[in-house]
């Protein structure tokens, strides 16, 4: 079978152009790479081999362990260079609230808040009330907070107290009397006195009063 002259002359030209293109590709690659070209009879793809080096990762300088012995024996790119730094300029470190139990008082959050606000208002109005021990213990910190706001006496603190206490007259009386009554006392403005259980459900009861 006779081969056309055009096909016979096209084969060397294509091979030359192919060799020229692969040579130009080899010259364009970095000097660190080794390129292996296949022979003219082989049709396997070109394999490119690059040197593999260990990753040069920067050392982590964030939340490092408090104990510097924990970083001994680690590679340079895994070791902690800086210790655990505590921010001095008013910074805070937050953690999870493990064990911080909130008294539920068998109420949803909105009803529980309203209950504590009402108990605080009644205690500041009458000076002494009788309730369950759980409620007395839960409302104690809110009563102390209102008295602390009244000791400050500023307009901002007064508005905060008006947003919590239900009766406006109690707030004005509180801000007028607290500085003279608790001016020298730092905390501990209430007292809880246990009493007999409630008749019917036997719930533990207590009196809570202002000191």
UniProtKB/Swiss-Prot annotation:
Transit peptide residues according to the UniProt entry: 1-95
What's the chief localization of this chain?
plastid
- InterPro entries from the entry? Ribosomal_bL17, Ribosomal_bL17_sf
What UniProt keywords are attached to this protein's entry?
Chloroplast, Plastid, Ribonucleoprotein, Ribosomal protein, RNA-binding, rRNA-binding, Transit peptide
Q: Name one GO cellular component term.
A: chloroplast
Output the GO biological process annotations, alphabetical, semicolon-separated. Answer: translation
Write out the annotated subcellular location: Plastid, Chloroplast
Single GO MF descriptor: rRNA binding
The record's comment on protein family reads:
Belongs to the bacterial ribosomal protein bL17 family.
Q: Which NCBIfam families match?
A: L17
What exactly does this protein do?
Answer: This protein binds directly to 23S ribosomal RNA.
Subunit description: Part of the 50S ribosomal subunit.
Q: What is this protein called?
A: Large ribosomal subunit protein bL17c
The record lists the organism as Arabidopsis thaliana
